[in-house]
Amino acid sequence: MFRNQYDTDVTTWSPAGRLFQVEYAMEAVKQGSACVGLRSRTHAVLAAANKAASELSSHQRKVFRVADHAGVALAGLTADGRVLSRFLRSECINHAFVYDAPLPVSRLALRLADKAQVCTQRSWKRPYGVGLLVAGLDESGAHLYYNCPSGNYFEYQAFAIGSRSQAAKTFLERRFEGYNDYTPEQLIKDALSAIKETLQGEKLTSSNCTVAIVGRKDDGTVEPFEMIDVKRIQEIIDSMEAAEEAPAAEAESSSMQEEDKGTDAAPMDI
């Protein structure tokens, strides 16, 4: 029994109860550049690694604004991601026109999941080969959802998708319990650190990552979804590197002091 007997059509089940075309779409998400999302009670942050197809080309956008209160980061087929981000933008505009209020983030993620699920039940369609991290703010606070090509969606405190995302997940799993009380600056630093884990030795700079944030200030005013300026990102990266180098410098200076003490010791009497 060969798999190719059951993977030519998205509506054909295998004897093991699997839809291979849907699984292939989920594998496409793992081939895209890494994206990270994390949230506190009041803010949500999205970060993405910028990967160019070749040295001669520029990178494609991975983070998109959907509305003032929400945005997405995507991994997989960027063209599919652009289509879905336009769909989400249209849903937010229609809801705001009818109800004069922003679309809750949970319903935004649900509508995206419903659209993806339809493609798993139509023989003339294919699943979207992209995974989306949906971050936003509503009356109940900040939210982060992951929407899968299968039509499933899950809410997370922190999550990572894309190539080598397991390294970022491991980093986030060690720290996510304190994220509810994090400041926006701390969230951005952890998002950048998680992206750095996926770069496999490549130096993290403001040119190879994108960061966006949305949240609510202490006085209750909403900070709209916005891309963080490249200059500010570089300043944060520089401060992170300085903080990492400080303990090493202290350890080196203390070891040198111990060596100096050893050379100044009086010789033993014979």
From Swiss-Prot:
UniProt xrefs under PROSITE patterns: PROTEASOME_ALPHA_1, PROTEASOME_ALPHA_2
Gene responsible for this protein: PAF1
UniProt key word Cytoplasm: yes
Record's keyword annotation contains Ligase: no
Name recorded for this polypeptide: Proteasome subunit alpha type-1
Extent of Low complexity compositional bias: 245-256
Subunit structure, interactors included: The 26S proteasome consists of a 20S proteasome core and two 19S regulatory subunits. The 20S proteasome core is composed of 28 subunits that are arranged in four stacked rings, resulting in a barrel-shaped structure. The two end rings are each formed by seven alpha subunits, and the two central rings are each formed by seven beta subunits. The catalytic chamber with the active sites is on the inside of the barrel.
Role, per record: The proteasome is a multicatalytic proteinase complex which is characterized by its ability to cleave peptides with Arg, Phe, Tyr, Leu, and Glu adjacent to the leaving group at neutral or slightly basic pH. The proteasome has an ATP-dependent proteolytic activity.
GO biological process: proteasome-mediated ubiquitin-dependent protein catabolic process
Span list, region Disordered: 239-270
Protein source organism: Oryza sativa subsp. japonica
Pfam families listed in its UniProt record: Proteasome (PF00227), Proteasome_A_N (PF10584)
Signal peptide start-end: none
Keyword list, A-Z: Cytoplasm, Nucleus, Proteasome
InterPro entries: Ntn_hydrolases_N (IPR029055), Proteasome_alpha (IPR050115), Proteasome_alpha-type (IPR023332), Proteasome_alpha1 (IPR035144), Proteasome_asu_N (IPR000426), Proteasome_sua/b (IPR001353)
Domain of life: Eukaryota
Cellular compartment(s): Cytoplasm; Nucleus
Principal cellular location given in the protein's record: cytoplasm
Entry GO CC: cytoplasm; nucleus; proteasome core complex, alpha-subunit complex
The family this protein is said to belong to: Belongs to the peptidase T1A family.
